[in-house]
Amino acid sequence: MGLEKSFILFSLLVLVLGWVQPSLGKESSAQKFNRQHMDTEGSSNSSPTYCNQMMTPRGMTKGSCKPVNTFVHETLADVQAICSQGQVTCKNGKSNCYKSSCALHITDCRLKGNSKYPNCDYKTSDYQKHIIIACEGNPSVPVHFDASE
């Protein structure tokens, strides 16, 4: 009887771990936004190789070169505050995008035309622009970088 009970408990444990385990290492949309777009510490002003230095460690050159990416050089709190600013329509037609009320320091990274994986080579461009981000959740947090203007 004890062996049967142990087998049943073990089977239940395996079943539960099968459900839970896939979600343990999964990155949330907010975490992905932070990884791909936030650089509160840095600025590309001093380095034309900024994008090349940032894209690989941030996981945007795994399997292919991400063609375009924007880094925001502001505090996370300032970027999160955009989620309560001017609501605009996203490029995909959804209504969960918000435009910053002031221009922010950003760096655009664009894949150079002759660049091919695995040697991803990016052009670095600094700007002061308004950004448009998609926000979700309660509290509302950034989950997608939609545009800059």
Curated annotation (Swiss-Prot):
Tissue: Pancreas.
Top-level taxon of origin: Eukaryota
Annotated localization: Secreted
Disulphides: C51-C109, C65-C120, C83-C135, C90-C97
Binding site for substrate: K32, R35, K66, P67, V68, N69, T70, K91, R110
MF terms in GO: lyase activity; nucleic acid binding; ribonuclease A activity
A family per Pfam: RnaseA
Signal peptide from the UniProt entry: 1-25
GO cellular component, one term: extracellular region
Catalytic class of the enzyme: lyase
Catalysed transformations (reactions): an [RNA] containing cytidine + H2O = an [RNA]-3'-cytidine-3'-phosphate + a 5'-hydroxy-ribonucleotide-3'-[RNA]; an [RNA] containing uridine + H2O = an [RNA]-3'-uridine-3'-phosphate + a 5'-hydroxy-ribonucleotide-3'-[RNA]
Cited function: Endonuclease that catalyzes the cleavage of RNA on the 3' side of pyrimidine nucleotides. Acts on single-stranded and double-stranded RNA.
Entry similarity comment: Belongs to the pancreatic ribonuclease family.
Record's subunit section: Monomer. Interacts with and forms tight 1:1 complexes with RNH1. Dimerization of two such complexes may occur. Interaction with RNH1 inhibits this protein.
Record protein name field: Ribonuclease pancreatic
Organism this protein belongs to: Leopoldamys edwardsi (Edwards's long-tailed giant rat)
Taxonomic lineage from the root: Eukaryota, Metazoa, Chordata, Craniata, Vertebrata
